[in-house]
């Protein structure tokens, strides 16, 4: 076992006279004065840096002397070299060059005269005048104008704000490559052109069908009998004649399930997508474009920009998916060529969307509005990368009820819901109040006008409408006995009975204002039946299965529907089963009091004898096991209400009398039980629900 101590243990005692000189006593020492052996001790020793400096100086002087005494440089170059020069370096810095301007033994050899190590810096060549774009700050944002271009180029043609920028964040330049830039090139140079020129693709001269190694290509067209492709250049001639419904159905159904599509995101239609669409048109007649995010707020603008910038025709659209037809006479060889944007330019500085005091409000009103908006319920929740086709319509409908509208945008990117707010400001129009807590709060403004406006002229109800309410003998509705009995029990009321209002208001039909009817007409016209679901084959075929005649417009259809509604309303007012209030009587208390008074004196309405037939209710009860004699009996009780077909709902227009006869008859008869017929005879098994308590206790014991 070893013992470890912090201090050494003194085994031997130290000497009394220690010798501080380590030399041995037999060493002979000489005096330095006048002694030859002490010469090396008296000289001053030079440092290593001084020695290296002297070596460099001597070598530099020797090199200069050799250059001066060498008259014929060619002869000197022709002389064979005994040994190549190798720099020995210095002891302190072996990798450093001992002589400036000469190679070190650690330096890499020159690759050759054609590739010098230190390339001279070539000044930037001025850009070509023909390709140099002009950067413009216009009302449409930042644009680039190039000579010979069909239109002004932008980074995004659909999502660029329609507001003039205040200033640029950096010096203006075009992002189309080195030939169009006025600043030093900091990126990677483009690859040199291939020596082998590729054959230009001609859509009118397709390769033979079935050739190996070639992708499938659709023929140009479709063409009508006797018509073929033509080399044309204008947009109208490329499109050709309008497509028929059969042609549209065939083109769209062939692209519904394709995965070769163009995805459009928050930046909308960008400049480089122009070439991408032409690449998709190279092999197919129709390009499928799927839009998600901010660009779906205004799909009309997306379709307009596509047809204007690229050409083609949007033949079908459903929600965020649209199909762009290239044209009957489209040729990929004669397509327009667009320069490629090599990077996204920096966005300029735009005015603030949210003002501290919005236009038309005071500071106190704006503060109260923002405080009220925090407690307001949002009309919808916008998801990330969703389809917002109906957002503008929903906001307009919400403004009919409340002056403030709140939209929940939690989870979205900050720039996305700000772009949505800017679009709503122009499309609705409205005033942006706040973007607080990822919520869009908008105000309808002072100059807002309702779509349900009431005219100034007032008169009796349906004064200007002349409708023949007389029914022919064949079309007269048959009156059932129950209906005739109900009608005789409630005779028609005279005008004096209609005026029995507790508040003293007149309830006669003559006091109805025609403005209410026109307001109802406008409200019916404001409804829209647009669907935003993604197209399917069945839905598309259902939309296209219509007669060849020219379809009726939505205005004509709504006009016919409104006329039918007005006829029914006029008949109801004349028969005393309906009442229309004035605009001044739209207070909640007034409406309630008049409704109560009218319900007590109104005549009954028509009785609908044939209501909806109720389905027979079938109740099945699971089988139970009985442990008597190891026998298992499965019984099921089935209760079928046979009188369900006899039940009828009687609805009286004006008093709402509902009589459910089928349910009462079902309660009187009770439920009927029926056992299933067993293949075997189980005599000791009692039917379910017939055992008494004593018998059940005996069985369980």
From Swiss-Prot:
PROSITE patterns hit by this protein: CRM
Transmembrane segments: none
GO cellular component, one term: chloroplast stroma
Domain of life: Eukaryota
GO biological process entries: Group II intron splicing; mRNA processing
Domain called CRM: residue spans: 241-337, 359-455
Transit peptide (residue range): 1-37
SMART domains xrefs: CRS1_YhbY (SM01103)
Keyword entries, A-Z: Chloroplast, mRNA processing, mRNA splicing, Plastid, Repeat, Ribonucleoprotein, RNA-binding, Transit peptide
Location(s) in or outside the cell: Plastid, Chloroplast stroma
Spans annotated as Disordered: 68-136, 191-221, 471-532
Ranges of Polar residues composition bias in the record: 479-492, 520-530
Null mutant phenotype: Plants are albinos.
UniProt xrefs under Gene3D superfamilies: YhbY-like
Predominant localisation class: plastid
GO MF: mRNA binding
Pfam family, one: CRS1_YhbY
SUPFAM superfamilies, A to Z: YhbY-like
Entry keyword Plastid: yes
Region (CRS2 binding): 564-586
Subunit structure: Interacts with CRS2 and RNA. Part of large ribonucleo-protein complexes that include group IIB introns, CRS2 and CAF1.
Function: Required for the splicing of group IIB introns in chloroplasts. Forms splicing particles with CRS2. Interacts with RNA and confers intron specificity of the splicing particles.
Name of protein: CRS2-associated factor 1, chloroplastic
Organism: Arabidopsis thaliana
